[in-house]
Amino acid sequence: MKKIWLALAGLVLAFSASAAQYEDGKQYTTLEKPVAGAPQVLEFFSFFCPHCYQFEEVLHISDNVKKKLPEGVKMTKYHVNFMGGDLGKDLTQAWAVAMALGVEDKVTVPLFEGVQKTQTIRSASDIRDVFINAGIKGEEYDAAWNSFVVKSLVAQQEKAAADVQLRGVPAMFVNGKYQLNPQGMDTSNMDVFVQQYADTVKYLSEKK
């Protein structure tokens, strides 16, 4: 009996220590107004945002977060249109096309690089070329671009940003209640930071 009790006590201590690693106001903040019906894990980004490029291409935050998510928990990525003027809005619509066609993974890197690295994306036509080079037929892209589904996805992205009162990117929210706070994490080591970021998302996704 004593051994069982000690084992249970050890589990409780382990859980308490794990929970104590995460503090509201440190690794995350609780939203003043929770958003009902928000995606379970929601990341906002812009192809114009240098930090978003770093999160995606250097730190691989999205990939690492997905690996840590509990079974059945889905991650959603939305593009914002408050950067880049009219081209930023075109990129939000293009991201809606990518979501509708299920080709996000094919176009993410070339869109980031075309905007920030090679600066070859300067118009809606240039964006279209990226999709075609990624293997999407021009007719398919054009049909999606003008579709009701894509227009709805654009509105959905804009509404989601307004609902959480988004002020900047990259930003990640969990269950419409919590926002990740990278400034409160260990930035002395890249691998440690990425691990802590992904672990915090996992913790919040399981938080009741």
Curated annotation (Swiss-Prot):
One term of GO molecular function: protein disulfide isomerase activity
InterPro entries: DSBA-like_thioredoxin_dom (IPR001853), DsbA/DsbL (IPR023205), Thiol_disulfide_DsbA (IPR050824), Thioredoxin-like_sf (IPR036249), Thioredoxin_CS (IPR017937), Thioredoxin_domain (IPR013766)
Keywords, alphabetical: Disulfide bond, Periplasm, Redox-active center, Signal
One Gene Ontology biological process: cellular response to antibiotic
Thioredoxin domain sequence ranges: 20-150
Endpoints of the signal sequence: 1-19
Compartments (UniProt record): Periplasm
Disulfide-bonded cysteines: 49-52
Record-stated family: Belongs to the thioredoxin family. DsbA subfamily.
Protein name (database record): Thiol:disulfide interchange protein DsbA
